[in-house]
Swiss-Prot record:
Function: Part of the ABC transporter complex RbsABC involved in ribose import. Responsible for energy coupling to the transport system.
Species name: Streptomyces coelicolor (strain ATCC BAA-471 / A3(2) / M145)
Protein name listed in UniProt: Ribose import ATP-binding protein RbsA 1
Homology family: Belongs to the ABC transporter superfamily. Ribose importer (TC 3.A.1.2.1) family.
One GO CC annotation: plasma membrane
Alphabetized UniProt keyword annotations: ATP-binding, Cell membrane, Membrane, Nucleotide-binding, Repeat, Sugar transport, Translocase, Transport
UniProt topology in membrane: Peripheral membrane protein
MF terms in GO: ABC-type D-ribose transporter activity; ATP binding; ATP hydrolysis activity
Gene name tied to this protein: rbsA1
Length: 505
């Protein structure tokens, strides 16, 4: 395949030897990047590698301390995001920010609606302009439909259409697939290819390496704020890219230790919550990692929340070590030895404006409170111990957890719950949105916990993770368990057949 530079095409947007520091922290060090028209270019690196700073530099949020941003080959200074937008640069974030009560057309042309002669908004022209954008993207979305109720995938398409309405030539897509189903990812990739074929330059950021290899032609890799390489993906393997990202050969990504399951630790029998899930039964034994697989909306997270007592169930029973749990009582579940690492770590697993040590210490307040006051020394000692065990990277343990990368935030959530000494650990999407190096660390941790006798129930939408880490795979479809598959029989085909309702339990 001919690269644009081989035909004399110049990069539409580039960085040359850009550096950026925040206090004593050097976020970018002599980083260079070239984005060409008609190409999808990946930006790869672990959390903390400098990807976010690079994106914000291209988008006009940050100004480089050294080096240059080049637009059509000429140095340019963006004084803010508005300058970058006017230059044709748009960022599509993983969580769109639309006004829910406005229509798709109103969201796209907010403050810029076509006007009639007397200054009144020309709704037909706004509708027609939006319809033309959707036609250009090859999607069918009603311009008059309210944004409320749109899927994340459709919201992202609206954001892309909005970017095109500003005549964007460069689209920066930051983890756009993190919350999408497989079919939604395929649809989004169709839109990306359309943009590419129409001459747009696309910078694509994803922790899912298979997506990078599927949609991108070239990749720039960052490590610890430094530029490592910019190169074609053709001829590379995922292992090659991982080595560039982490600077070493990564140990096995799925280091599952073989164990002999012990006694039954968790038993769920005929659990039902009307309209959500029905007649769900399974068990997890000590030393096992049992995966709960299925499509988004199948009811997996809802089952986990009910088991832990966050939500009440209407029928059925849950037992830990043969003793029944009280319906809808998380404190009782904790006391029985259950721990739940939730899917949304920022909203449900952490208090973002609280320190790292306080977040880790939240589950141990009963053991660190003396005479009605928290023993800060005991709390800090306990938190430091777990932060070291899980290799959390931070400047000071008193810093807010919001200052950490996504992978280190996930380690804090894990530390908080492991500090309770759980018999049963439920982890919901444990590696979503974290880099490949941290993902391997989380997998090693789960494997070691199972080897130590903890019963692990792992909810995951990452099929390679399910196949690589689970002793057994339970599959849900539309609120029901449709299959239980052994490790030896589990394949992408058997799991997906059950997840889509094509296999019977």
């Amino acid at each position: 395949m001919t690269h644009p530079s081989d035909t004399g095409s110049a990069p539409v947007l580039a960085l040359r030897d850009v550096s950026k520091s925040f206090g004593a922290v050097r976020a970018l060090r002599d980083v260079s990047l070239e984005l060409f028209p008609g190409e999808v270019h990946a930006l790869a690196g672990e959390n903390g590698a400098g990807k976010s700073t690079l994106i914000k530099t291209l988008a006009g949020v940050h100004r480089p301390d050294a080096g240059h941003v080049l637009l059509d080959g000429a140095p340019v200074v963006f004084h803010g995001p508005g300058d970058a937008r006017d230059a044709g640069i748009a960022v599509i974030y993983q969580e769109p920010t639309l006004f829910p009560d406005l229509s798709i057309a109103e969201n796209i042309f907010m403050g810029r609606q076509p006007r009639r002669a007397l200054g009144r908004i020309d709704h037909k022209a706004t509708h027609d302009a939006t319809a033309a954008l959707m036609l250009r993207l090859g999607v069918e979305l009603d311009p008059d439909r309210p944004a409320r109720g749109l899927s994340i995938a459709d919201q992202q398409i609206v954001e892309i259409a909005k970017a095109l309405s500003f005549d964007a030539r460069v689209l920066i897509m930051d983890e756009p697939t993190a919350a999408l189903t497989g079919s939604e990812v395929a649809r989004l990739f169709g839109v990306v290819r359309t943009l590419r074929d129409q001459g747009a330059a696309v910078l694509f950021i994803s922790h899912r390496l298979e997506e990078i290899f599927h949609i991108c032609a070239r990749v720039t890799t960052l490590r610890d704020g430094a530029w490592i390489a910019s190169e074609p993906l053709e001829g590379m393997t995922e292992d090659d890219l991982v080595r560039r990202m982490v600077g070493r050969d990564l140990d096995e990504l799925y280091p599952k230790q073989e164990v002999t399951p012990g006694e039954r630790a968790l038993s769920v029998r005929r659990l039902t919550r009307e309209g959500v899930f029905t007649d769900v039964s399974f068990e997890v034994r000590r030393g096992e990692i049992v995966a709960l697989a299925g499509l988004v909306g199948a009811g997996r997270t809802e089952v986990a929340r009910a088991v832990f007592g966050v939500d009440r169930w209407d029928a059925g029973e849950v037992e830990v070590d043969g003793k029944p749990l009280v319906n809808g009582a998380p404190s009782t579940a904790m006391a029985a030895g259950l721990a739940l690492v939730p899917e949304d770590r920022r909203a449900q697993g952490l208090v973002m404006d609280m320190s790292i040590e306080r977040n880790i210490g939240l589950t141990g307040l009963r053991t660190t409170v003396k005479a009605g006051l928290v023993d800060r020394g005991a709390e800090r000692s306990r938190s430091l111990d777990w932060a070291v065990k899980l290799q959390v990277k931070y400047a000071r343990i008193a810093d807010t957890v919001a200052t950490l990368s996504g992978g280190n935030q996930q380690k804090v959530v894990l530390a908080k719950w492991l500090a309770t000494g759980p018999k049963v650990l439920i982890v919901d999407e444990p590696t979503r949105g974290i880099d490949v190096g941290t993902k391997a660390e989380v997998h090693r941790l789960l494997s070691q916990l199972a080897a130590d006798g903890v019963a692990v129930l792992m909810i995951s939408s990452d099929l390679p993770e399910v196949l690589g880490m689970a002793d057994r795979v339970l599959v849900m479809h539309e609120g029901r368990l449709t299959a239980e598959i052994s490790r030896t029989d589990a394949t992408e085909e058997t799991v997906m057949a059950a997840a889509t309702g094509r296999a019977a339990a």
